[in-house]
């Protein structure tokens, strides 16, 4: 049936096209030059089978009208020739949001926000001898915790070749003295070279309107490194190192308020001070420096005594007013008149003393 249908279409084309009929009557009976276009025409004829028909030909006309019109861009148009208003209207038509401006700001992390893996000072440190049982026990615990610190020191040396835990104590002591000297002098610019950004507000807090006398007298024991840790911030390449140094020294401290009254300490009394000071360095930074970062205050340390200058305001309780009767009011008026007359009498005594000199010598 399909072959018969195709043959019928060929005959119809031959009847419609007179040029084809004349070519067919030529000697030889061939189609000649018109054979190839005719074959292409026959091949382009749509043949519809049962499988090619739509399964539901109900809305055939509406499906014919259904199409998507593509708005193709003009490739010959240059980006520089389009105005901002025209670009804005085109983006608004297509529902495209404008590009967001770059609002993020670069930030620099120069120090950490606290102490990571803080050192826990042994109770009674500085008071127990190494020869005693408790002192030997403290020394043994220190050796057990030393393995992590050695790994941290090795990590610090990979960034700073000149670092030595034996020589760092003297360097840390110089930083400690310089920081406290500038704090007592209230030099808020030079102190920033020796303290971190976290430590600066804690040291300079409540220093205003006060006179501070501080002096580092001597070291009772040489300062030594007791703890070292290295951590990363945000990325693995951003490394920070913290070293805890033990100071046992003699210091003098006296604090006066704005009126010159002694608030704390004394300028003639020296005290033994045991401190665990944390120093930090941004070891990833080539120009990083060791700076005072924080102090470790153990839980077993007794609380500080308050300033000796304290005031207590004692207010007298107000008595409620009493109601006076008519008789009491008259008595009170008579008493007041008598008191006024008594006050006026002594006024004449100075005059008499001038007129009549006393005989007593």
Swiss-Prot record:
Per the record, the GO terms for biological process are: mitochondrial translation
Assigned protein family:
Belongs to the mitochondrion-specific ribosomal protein mL45 family.
Q: Molecular function (GO) terms listed? A: structural constituent of ribosome
One Pfam family per UniProt: Tim44
Which InterPro entries does this entry report, sorted A to Z?
mtLSU_mL45 (IPR051975), NTF2-like_dom_sf (IPR032710), Tim44-like_dom (IPR007379)
Q: Report the record's disulfide bonds.
A: none
Give the protein's recorded name.
Answer: Large ribosomal subunit protein mL45
Question: Lineage of the native species?
Answer: Eukaryota, Metazoa, Ecdysozoa, Arthropoda, Hexapoda
Q: Does the keyword Kinase apply?
A: no
Instruction: Look up the record and report any one GO term of the cellular component aspect.
Output: mitochondrion
Alphabetized, the UniProt keywords read: Mitochondrion, Ribonucleoprotein, Ribosomal protein, Transit peptide
Could you tell me which SUPFAM superfamilies the record lists for this protein? NTF2-like
Keyword check for Iron-sulfur: no
Domain of life, per lineage: Eukaryota
Q: What is its subcellular localisation?
A: Mitochondrion
Disordered, as annotated region: 319-361
